Amino acid sequence: MSDTLLIRNVRPAGGTATDVLIRDGRIAAIGAGATGGDASFDAGGRLMIPGLVEAHTHLDKSFWGMGWHKHTAGPALIDKIETERRNRREFGIDANRQSGRLVAQMVKLGTTHIRSHVDVDTDLG
């Protein structure tokens, strides 16, 4: 993997097209004078935005990649907990598999940081 990447003809935050040099995963220079790069490519005037952040998710409860299931939990917190436990058993939800599926999709769509909550309970062992 290259330590530096020169992205030519890109529009940071929708502004005027320019060049951006990335070094060690961070922006090192912006402007037509940005040079160098172990690798480079022309972005064709595309938009450059910061990576997306998912600040609150429950990766272990994802149905991503599975069929559609109606949400049947009641309004109380205990209703939601019991429904989630029942769904886990009934639909054979594997937290590792489902978490991986959802993370892969998030990264594909531009997410660079994820903060997740997970269950630790007697049903999981």
Regions found by a protein language model. Name each.
Residues 62-95:
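Active-site gating loops and adjacent loop-to-helix segments of metal-dependent hydrolytic enzymes
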Residues 4, 50-52, 115:
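Hydrophobic "anchor" residues on beta-strands that sit immediately upstream
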Residues 38-43:
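Short, well-ordered secondary-structure micro-motifs within conserved domains or adaptor modules
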Residues 45-47, 99-100:
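Short hydrophobic "helix-edge" motifs at membrane interfaces and signal-peptide entry regions
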Residues 53-57, 84, 109:
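Single, functionally critical "micro-switch" positions that shape active/binding sites
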Residues 86-125:
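Active-site loop-helix segments enriched in His/Asp/Glu that coordinate
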